[in-house]
Regions:
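Boundary detector for helix-to-coil junctions that initiate low-complexity/charged tails
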Residues: 2-7, 18-44, 289-294, 706-952
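Acidic donor-binding segment of Leloir-type glycosyltransferases
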Residues: 85-123
């Protein structure tokens, strides 16, 4: 994993730049697709997006068997489950083997799986046997023609399995396929290695685990080595490569590998480094000879020869998705996803259709760098870059398959030549499906005026033809009058709520680009191609500079004329005037419009340029070529249109006649900008475009159901498609060869320039060297003359120096004597310094002792202060206790007095009782002695004492 490139910071989530784009194995027929601006955004999108691809019905004969081993899985399973169960390919079974889990919650989760989905089949191990054994057990029960290996904590793009299946179905020479991977969790990076680099596999595992393997080819070599507790997948891939099975890695990021530092395979390897090294060397030793005896080169899919049987190929399986959104299921064919007006229109349209409940599937037909892919992916993940998965001979089969799988209602073509040649087949086979195309402009330099020509030629197979301007609608009717009833005009419009001038960003961007406050910024947001006439733009700016006008040109764009344009700028010495930046995302482009004062677009041809819509919405005055339908948008009070000329001085002067007043008059710019925004807000808001397109979609659905399908000659249609494919392939190869030739020419040009520069430098250096030699010769002659004069002067001075020398000798002797005295004093001083040094050392040692004593004293004082505080606290406590004791003593004293009084009362009562007892005793004694009268007398005494009134 450490060898991966394209690292994205986990802390900052930095933007993935264009530098990450690579040429895929030297095969220009494929495109690398970057999913999102950073790893975290992509992963969050997979985890949070709600998808409706699931078909709950289990297949009796599944095409794919997903293989998973389950051991105490719990934490991340739900995320994995959702990305698997919501795949766009639903013809699968999911076999999960419980490798004797011990966690009760994990066991309960496992036992609930068959109830959650009819596609899941579960099996058990009685003992824990490891990941390899779990996979092997699952494979034994697999019924699919393909095996897909899935760990239960990773994530998948919704189209992952489907793209793998489509690839292997149309590339029988390959046994397995994977994709680029996104590493996330504890580490975030993009992994772009894979099976297209087989020679690298002996050094490291080039894939992160999720691959689709033909079951027949897998069974031929057997399962995973169950003796290996880790790296069992690496060992199995090496076995396949060593036995001449080949695989491919699709250059798209279709799976996410959870990189965990504290658990999992990586953690196990780190915790037991010696075992990891032993297993690694064991695996390498098994296949080192096979890799060394064979020279493995990078692999690339080969395009089959033109064969009508390939054209008639059809996928022999079904994949019906559970789609209920009838009437709103759209298959869109687009050529690319990059900076440009047509792609921005598609982005706006698809985004709003998705918000209105449409289900969109997008097919890309051109291999290039799709800079805006991730923005379309944010609208719908159901995107297929056809060159990455299929040969063009199989694109017709793909279209048939998708229409059936997604139950497509509408097929929408936007600037895709290839899709037009599929129309005769699709219109004939799917009469209930509506077919619409959308065209932005004519193109005089492409295929004979471009898309309008092919649209008009195949108009009978289109239910409706939508154009971006009335100008283009009129042009269609000239090409083919029969298109009149099918034509609809829908302008691309602009989101006026989003596209507003941002004054804070204006200053920020101008400061960043070094544009002074008084400079007028002129914006050129376009690809550097002949259509946009970048050289004419440079000429116009140069003339403005010649007139001493303070202007700065901002160019947003790039393409194959970039180097030539830069060379022209350098030749005119205008580097300080131009700010050239690469194409930006739509949200970022707004900032540059806000920073600009004028939009200048001297195009060769246009429909209605999207840049003009955007500039008018941001209140930037427009100066553009009067071509196409641009007069339908730009009126005299809202901008300036200049008649297209020959790109000569006269046309430059025509632009200057408009630009100079705008540059010099701020009030004019402000007035035109406000009027422009008012016009687009009133007549061209984006909502109007979406409403219009939805109205057309509804109308065309009804037309398709009522119209009679046109007659199709299958042989002629087939021949036309083959002709186009041959021409398309020839053009692709020529373009590739032209690029190589152009690259070679550029290299030769660089070498020629280097040689010329070297020759000029050498000539200049030789001339300078001769001049320097002549200068040095003249200096030498002058120096010799000076030496001669100096010799004469020295001879005349010799005698006087001799006398002076004698005097100096006497002075030296006196100096020596004085020096001896100084030496004596110096020795005394040295001894004194040594004494001072000893004293200093003694004082330093004493200082350290005093410092220690002071520190001890400070600590003792601290202790004394603490003890004093404790004593004070104790005294306060004793005083409070004494007060309590005094109160208690007073209380007990009172109680004691009460007790004493009570005691005296009790003693008195006791005395009384004793007297009573004595009287009773006397009575009893008298009665016993029959002394009745004594007893009676005693009785009466007792009665009187007691106060009794008792009769005898």
């Amino acid at each position: 994993l450490e060898i991966a490139i394209g690292v994205v910071s986990a802390q900052t989530g930095d933007r993935i730049t264009d530098s990450l784009a690579i040429e895929v194995s030297g095969d220009s027929t494929m495109s690398e697709l970057i999913p999102y601006p950073n790893v975290r955004a992509f992963v969050n999108g997979l985890q949070s997006r709600e998808l409706d691809f699931e078909n709950p019905v289990a297949s009796a004969e599944p095409v794919v068997s997903i293989i998973s081993s389950f051991y105490n899985v719990r934490d991340y399973f739900e995320q994995t489950y959702q990305t698997v169960i919501c795949q766009t390919f639903q013809n699968f079974e999911w076999i999960i083997v419980n490798d004797c889990s011990t966690d009760p919650e994990a066991i309960a989760l496992f036992e609930s799986l068959p109830e959650r989905s009819a596609k899941i089949r579960t099996f058990h191990h009685d003992t824990n046997r490891g990941l390899a054994a779990g996979r092997n057990t699952a494979i034994q029960h697999a019924r699919g023609r393909y095996l897909f290996f899935m760990d239960l904590d990773d994530l998948l793009d919704p189209t992952c399995i489907e793209k793998f299946v489509l690839f292997l179905e149309t590339h029988p020479e390959f046994s397995f396929v994977s994709s680029y991977s996104v590493l996330f969790h504890d580490r975030e990076l993009l992994w772009i290695h894979g099976f297209h680099e087989p020679a690298e596999f002996l050094d490291r595992n080039g894939v992160t685990g999720r691959i689709l393997y033909r079951k027949a080819d897998f069974d031929e070599l057997g399962g995973f080595d169950e003796d290996l507790r880790f790296y069992e997948d690496w060992e199995r891939w090496l076995k396949a490569i060593a036995n001449n099975q080949i695989g491919w890695t699709i250059p798209e990021f279709l799976d996410c590998y959870r990189h965990k530092n504290k658990s999992g395979l990586l953690a196990s390897a780190k915790q037991n480094v010696e075992e990891e090294q032993r297993v690694s060397e064991l695996i390498r030793s098994r296949y080192r000879d096979a890799f060394e005896t064979r020279k493995l080169s990078e692999i690339a899919p080969t395009r089959p020869d033109f064969d009508v049987r390939e054209l008639r190929f059809q996928f022999d399986f079904e994949n019906p998705l559970d789609r209920t959104n009838e009437g709103k299921r759209v298959l869109c064919f687009v050529p690319q996803m990059k900076v440009g007006g047509s792609d921005k229109f598609n982005l706006d349209l698809f985004g709003h259709l998705q918000q209105r409940g449409y289900d969109l599937t997008i097919a890309i037909t051109i291999s290039t760098q799709h800079d805006w892919y991730w923005q379309f992916h944010d609208i719908t993940p159901d995107i297929f870059c056809l060159p990455n998965c299929l040969h063009d001979l199989h694109w017709l089969a793909f279209a048939r398959y998708i229409i059936k799988s997604r139950q497509i209602d509408i097929v929408f073509l936007s600037n895709s030549y290839f899709a037009y040649y599929l129309l005769p087949f699709l219109q004939h086979e799917f009469p209930d499906v509506a077919f619409i195309d959308y065209t932005h402009t004519d193109d005089p330099g492409s295929y004979g005026i471009g898309y309008p020509r092919v649209s008009c030629q195949l108009a009978q197979f289109l239910d409706t033809q939508v154009v971006a301007s009335q100008y283009l609608a009129n042009y269609y009717q000239q090409l083919n009058p029969e298109t009149q009833d099918k034509l609809r005009v829908c302008r691309i419009n602009v989101d006026t709520q989003k596209w507003q001038r941002d004054f804070d960003k204006r200053q920020e961007i101008r400061d960043r680009l070094g544009i002074s406050p008084d400079a007028i910024a002129i914006l050129f947001p376009a690809r550097i191609v002949p259509q946009k006439r970048p050289f004419l733009f440079v000429d116009i700016i140069a003339k403005l500079v010649e007139r001493n006008l303070s202007v700065v040109a901002i160019i947003l764009g790039s393409d194959y004329l970039y180097d030539d344009m830069q060379a022209k700028i350098d030749k005119l010495d205008l580097q300080s005037v131009f700010r050239i930046l690469p194409s930006a995302a739509p949200d970022e482009v707004i900032e540059f419009y806000s920073a600009s004062d004028i939009l200048l677009l001297p195009s060769e041809y246009e429909g209605i340029s999207l840049a003009i819509y955007e500039a008018m919405s941001v209140q930037v005055p427009v100066v553009a070529a009067d071509v196409g339908g641009q007069a339908e948008l730009v009126t005299p009070e809202t901008g300036f249109l200049v008649p297209k000329g020959q790109g000569d001085a006269a046309e430059v002067e025509a632009y200057l006649n408009v630009l100079v007043p705008l540059v010099e008059d701020a009030n004019l710019r402000d007035r035109v900008g406000k009027a422009a925004r008012e016009r687009v807000v009133r007549h061209f808001p984006l909502e109007n475009m979406v409403d219009r397109m939805e109205e057309i979609f509804t109308e065309v659905r009804q037309l398709a159901q009522n119209n009679t399908p046109p007659d199709v000659n299958p042989v002629l249609a087939e021949e036309s498609l083959i002709w186009f494919l041959e021409y398309f392939e020839f053009e692709r190869r020529m373009a590739s060869q032209w690029q190589k030739t152009q690259s070679w020419v550029n290299e030769l040009q660089k070498h020629r320039d280097w040689l010329e520069q070297k020759y000029r430098q050498e000539g200049e250096q030789s001339r300078q060297w001769i001049q320097e030699l002549q200068t040095q010769l003249e200096r030498s002659r002058q120096w010799i003359e000076q030496l001669e004069a100096s010799r004469n002067w020295f001879e005349s001075q010799y005698q006087s120096w001799k006398e002076t020398a004698q005097q100096r000798q006497e002075e030296i002797e006196r100096s020596q004597q004085w020096n001896q005295e100084l030496q004596t004093q110096l020795e005394q001083s040295r001894q004194w310094v040594e004494q001072l040094e000893a004293s200093r050392n003694w004082f330093e040692s004493q200082y350290q002792n005093w410092k220690q004593i002071a520190e001890q004293t400070r600590q003792e004082l601290e202790q004394a202060r603490d003890w004093s505080e404790q004593l004070q606290a104790g005294r306060d406590w004793f005083e409070s206790q004494l007060h309590e004791w005094q109160n208690s003593a007073r209380y007990h004293q009172g109680e004691l007095e009460k007790t004493r009084a009570e005691l005296e009362r009790v003693q008195a009562m006791a005395k009384t009782e004793r007297d009573r007892a004595e009287q009773l005793e006397a009575i009893i004694t008298a009665m016993e002695s029959s002394k009745f009268w004594q007893a009676r007398s005693a009785w009466f005494k007792l009665k009187q004492r007691l106060g009794l009134e008792v009769e005898d």
